[in-house]
Amino acid sequence: MKLLSKIMIIALAASMLQACNSPGGMNKQGTGTLLGGAGGALLGSQFGKGKGQLVGVGVGALLGAVLGGQIGAGMDEQDRRLAELTSQRALETAPSGSNVEWRNPDNGNYGYVTPNKTYRNSNGQYCREYTQTVVIGGKQQKAYGNACRQPDGQ
């Protein structure tokens, strides 16, 4: 839990720095980099103990930030909203291996979420592996992740 708090503090600090650095606040690429880095750090924190866990956090944050920045650079607010809603729907209701697609008619960007294996983690939470694919400006990017249901049901 202490590690998660440190990650969130770092993410918040990076967010404030990015917002101050960009005219008009945080841009799409900065948001993608920040969210990707925080998500990667959180995912990396699930592996190893002690120094091994710190390595996992560092590697996860770096890879997440790079991928998030690339994706975020081309996604607008509507793209992000469509992707988020589709992810929630796919993870809640779609059978494993099926694609649930979103498409932004205003710019032609699209993507899909493919839920995979459902399992219970060591804390007893129900989790699901998934693949998220986005096509922004004709370029495809893929990301892999795990989502776990929280105690409040979300």
Curated annotation (Swiss-Prot):
Lipidated positions per record (S-diacylglycerol cysteine): C20
N-palmitoyl cysteine lipid sites: C20
UniProt-annotated location(s): Cell outer membrane
Superkingdom, taxonomy of origin: Bacteria
Gene source species: Rickettsia australis
Keyword check for Zinc: no
Signal peptide (residue range): 1-19
Family: Belongs to the rickettsiale 17 kDa surface antigen family.
Gene Ontology CC: cell outer membrane
Descriptive protein name: 17 kDa surface antigen
Topology of this chain in the membrane: Lipid-anchor
Keywords: Cell outer membrane, Lipoprotein, Membrane, Palmitate, Signal
Lineage: Bacteria, Pseudomonadati, Pseudomonadota, Alphaproteobacteria, Rickettsiales
Membrane-traversing stretches: none
